[in-house]
């Protein structure tokens, strides 16, 4: 197997490791002899310290063998914004009041307003408190894994550039890919929870097949629109998504949940704060059978766009099934939906960047002391993370119902609690 690193790459890595292990860079690896000298200096700091230094440097280094990229990295938020405890304050607009600076006639009632009257004063200290809603996102989930490194592996790694490159391959590449895919799977659960949660709350889920049939007074099925009438349907979908994207820029109480005991929350989502995740195979068909510019993400101008080839399972790529965590709009508490939701065909979701996401708050690798009997070390990786779904932020889910005659029109199936089917998605929205 070919090495994953060039000699220049190896020198840079080992110099970084030396700085991490010793705190100084008095010797720099520039060729084989200096590489060995630096390796000896590092090993003199102790094998446990050496492995810790290697772990620290490599966990922040991209190794370009065949790294696996998280297909849903679009969901990841920063620790600064989404740490372990987040208090999100929402401010409501205050109603305008009668002017006290002029005597005037009320335009609605016709009554005369005379605040400026001889012998009276205008109270400029009338209290009018701001109206706010506080939403708390708390909680931390933890994850741990470890692997074993034998002492001879470490000693051999510093004999030459090629040995070190082989060591790095065994040390990190597969491990890094495994961790990245773990993140993707958790991001996928957050996405499933958000999509099913919007439907469980009856909150802006658009059946594009039903909308098409309503607009054009037709009774086409989903299968017909995806084949015989694909051109017309593609144009309709493109126009609808672009229109919705523009509508999200308006400051309204639409496209998100509102608490029943509070005034409506006014939200707007500028283009730069919009994100979109779409099922790409359909648009590949559109590009191949219609024309490539009918739906181009760049035309939307959203902040971030991600195409995926399946939502939940590769064998059933368009399906989404889940019993979501939702927001109780009566008491403001996070709760689990009473019934699971099943979509046959989800097309995509357009959402505010604060609507959902994951946050990896802490990642570190720690090495154990040498096992004297077995001559090996264990390297543990610890991860602390959290997820969030804020249903009070804007989001629109697009799905394709079965279509056909109105009596046969399909909405996502809602499973009863006695159903034999199992939910495969259950993620806390705001624990």
Predicted regions and their residues:
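Long, contiguous amphipathic alpha-helices that act as assembly "spine/axial" helices in icosahedral shell
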Residues: 131-204, 375, 379-381
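Loop-centered beta-sheet repeat module
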Residues: 174, 185-237
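Extended oligomerization regions of viral-like shell subunits
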Residues: 224-357
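Assembly/oligomerization interface modules of large self-assembling protein complexes
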Residues: 54-147
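Extended, compositionally biased alpha-helical segments that mediate assembly or anchoring
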Residues: 1-65, 69, 294-431
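Alpha-helix boundary/N-cap detector
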Residues: 5-8, 12, 38-49, 53, ...
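Short glycine-rich, low-complexity/disordered patches
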Residues: 30-32, 68-78, 184, 250-259
